[in-house]
Amino acid sequence: MTLVLFATEYDSAHIVANVLSQTPTDHCVFPLLVKHQVSRRVYFCLQTQKCSDSRRVAPVFAVNNETLQLSRYLAARQPIPLSALIASLDEAETRPLYRHLFRTPVLSPEHGGEVREFKHLVYFHHAAVLRHLNQVFLCPTSPSWFISVFGHTEGQVLLTMAYYLFEGQYSTISTVEEYVRSFCTRDLGTIIPTHASMGEFARLLLGSPFRQRVSAFVAYAVARNRRDYTELEQVDTQINAFRERARLPDTVCVHYVYLAYRTALARARLLEYRRVVAYDADAAPEAQCTREPGFLGRRLSTELLDVMQKYFSLDNFLHDYVETHLLRLDESPHSATSPHGLGLAGYGGRIDGTHLAGFFGTSTQLARQLERINTLSESVFSPLERSLSGLLRLCASLRTAQTYTTGTLTRYSQRRYLLPEPALAPLLERPLPVYRVHLPNDQHVFCAVASETWHRSLFPRDLLRHVPDSRFSDEALTETVWLHDDDVASTSPETQFYYTRHEVFNERLPVFNFVADFDLRLRDGVSGLARHTVFELCRGLRRVWMTVWASLFGYTHPDRHPVYFFKSACPPNSVPVDAAGAPFDDDDYLDYRDERDTEEDEDGKEDKNNVPGNGVFQKTTSSVDTSPPYCRCKGKLGLRIITPFPACTIAVHPSVLRAVAQVLNHAVCLDAELHTLLDPISHPESSLDTGIYHHGRSVRLPYMYKMDQDDGYFMHRRLLPLFIVPDAYREHPLGFVRAQLDLRNLLHHHPPHDLPALPLSPPPRVILSVRDKICPSTEANFIETRSLNVTRYRRRGLTEVLAYHLYGGDGATAAAISDTDLQRLVVTRVWPPLLEHLTQHYEPHVSEQFTAPHVLLFQPHGACCVAVKRRDGARTRDFRCLNYTHRNPQETVQVFIDLRTEHSYALWASLWSRCFTKKCHSNAKNVHISIKIRPPDAPMPPATAV
């Protein structure tokens, strides 16, 4: 049968109804497309609003071609009058199309009873016929509709309509338009004016030379559609195959699927694919779209899956994608490049002294004490900040001065003013640890301690009496060590020092031990873990740690290198969920202020990420175990994992520790045996908190409690030891147990004590950097980093944009920006609009802190962050709070300027502050102003507040 797609200049539904009722009018129908097939009947069609099984046109009436002579109108490119259609109407073929509308008999005395003739039925059901036509069919009356839907050129419209409307396929209009562009690579015909009449539009289509190419295009489109389906099916198969065999965490798996499709179907990749499958006029129809089969899948494998195959394999990841830079130092103790010559000393002091000796004070008392020290030593030593930062600097400094006060020339440290007790003088030659102690009612004191009684105050004398020095399992050995338990806190800082102590990280000191805050997020419904599961988890984590240590640093002997595990005590049975909080369990910013205006402890912060379970105990091993669960934790399982760096190896910058934690986070998900254990019970991604490796952050020490925020005076969730003995000490584990009880092995900045002798010790080394080549930033994982590479607009590098603002177009390729250049940019282009907004929209008591007579100092912290300080002689001062007027206002609020880029050369600057009070959300980042700074050759826009 022959199909004719037609249109009208008047309402098509009424015109069709006139044809059906054989009511002659002066209207015409305009044939647009014809699909010829030898037949006596011609079906006139309209486009349907809905398509079932990809049928997008349907007939509205049929005519006898012997009467109509359709070819005569097509050859003359003329419209068909309604009279010709009425004369040739084939009622036998047309009547079934509307039979469902004529179910109600119509009685008419004028027609001798029941109406049976078709035209009379249409007449009496005229409203139903019109409603049916309007609901089922699209009835455009203007060429502009066809142009806007199918294309603006002659070839685009004709070929798209022919394939999309007449061929039973599942392609969208956009897909067919792409096929047309690949088929007609050079010429798509003339542009059709949108103001053309329907007659002109019909004559253009009927006389178009592209009519001769319809059959070739249909064959090409079918082949191309088949090729596209095959390519996409292969991409689906590859993505699913990698997802099934890779051990990806749940969230990473979801992001991986999006990344994989964005990589395979990126714009540049599809343009290459179009060139591969473009129409070849010299090839046979069956040879079209057969070049380079599997193109998209092959490129996906090359650009992503092969990389992920290596990146998500532990051995390949550590060998190919992680690089470590270590600096070898001189072994001579008197050399300037030896650890001693470089001042790379760890904590001194005694852990088993005769008494507790040190400074204890709140933040207010600390500020007063540091002010006193500045007054006493101002002519000799540089002034200290009156905050925790100043205390950390004081306790880390190795600077000394000469004095004749004793009658002879001697040297003394500035710490002498902090701890003036003469007996402590020898202990002040080396750095001192700084701790935070959590007191009842959410109060905190800071401690700088030179001597303490660790073992005598913390452990019973007969603690190791029943610990065997023979071969024992880890589980049995752990159960032989019993610690006395306390639950009520004391208001005395000296007493509480041995119950709720946190070590404060000091970036001025080298790091000897890697302290990991490991919070394993449990799946919903997991409310209890068997003992075997917990210890197998620790053994698996130890295996991963040793694999990473051996790969990154060398000189690691897995059979003897110590890894110390501590687990947060389970909540009591009466607690339905993990009341102590969820991930990120012990770290906190530590610049606490007065007790009346201080921040929340870490528990409040932890609850943000808590995902409590509400189920019952689930078995995690295949063996049948009817004993009660060993661990009743819900939501998360908190571990502290501490291991020293290899012998004679230290880290000197917090970024190294954050990078190591990032590597470990990824490695934990790649160990096959460990993944098998973790997958049913947990979400192992990002279990290590990298935030604790910042200056002034603290982490709870092993054997210490947490304060219950609700009760105020009760302690809970003590960090208890789990002994995972290395193989070399399996026969005599007592020495390892003693090492895990030794405080010196559990601190960031203390050299390990009683480190087992190694067959071959390395020379003194400093870890300069650890870098993931694919994910150099600790803020983004592999998926996020790769996603940036396939986005439509790639963000310009910050160095490039800063250079453009400093030097114009000639400097946009600068390799690096110095701190001096960055300061100049901030002073000349960034700070003026920020200050203008401050003075216009903030209270005078806030803005006057940044205006004359105050002198501001801008201190770059990397390329994207600049600290704002006030100069006070040789000292620097911070600011009062920019948000509120607190009851005890202090100049301790840190202010920063963040710089970031977009896809253009515009530079975004944000002014933000960090206040340490509860009212300001306890050290949260508070953004005040964000402005967009256009390049130097563009006008400056107004600042907008955030």
From Swiss-Prot:
Q: How does it assemble?
A: Associates with the helicase and the primase-associated factor to form the helicase-primase factor.
What are the subcellular locations of this protein? Host nucleus
Q: Where is this site: Essential for primase activity?
A: 517, 519
- Composition-biased stretches, type Polar residues, lie in 617-626
Going by the UniProt record, its keywords in alphabetical order are: DNA replication, Host nucleus, Host-virus interaction, Metal-binding, Transferase, Zinc, Zinc-finger
Q: Could you tell me which cysteines form disulfide bridges?
A: none
**Keyword Transferase among record annotations:** yes
Quote one Gene Ontology molecular function term. zinc ion binding
Is Metal-binding among this UniProt entry's keywords? yes
Q: Which domain of life is it from?
A: Viruses
Protein name per the record? DNA primase
- Which GO biological process annotations does it have? bidirectional double-stranded viral DNA replication; DNA replication
**Record's function text:** Essential component of the helicase/primase complex. Unwinds the DNA at the replication forks and generates single-stranded DNA for both leading and lagging strand synthesis. The primase initiates primer synthesis and thereby produces large amount of short RNA primers on the lagging strand that the polymerase elongates using dNTPs.
Region labeled Disordered — which residues? 596-626
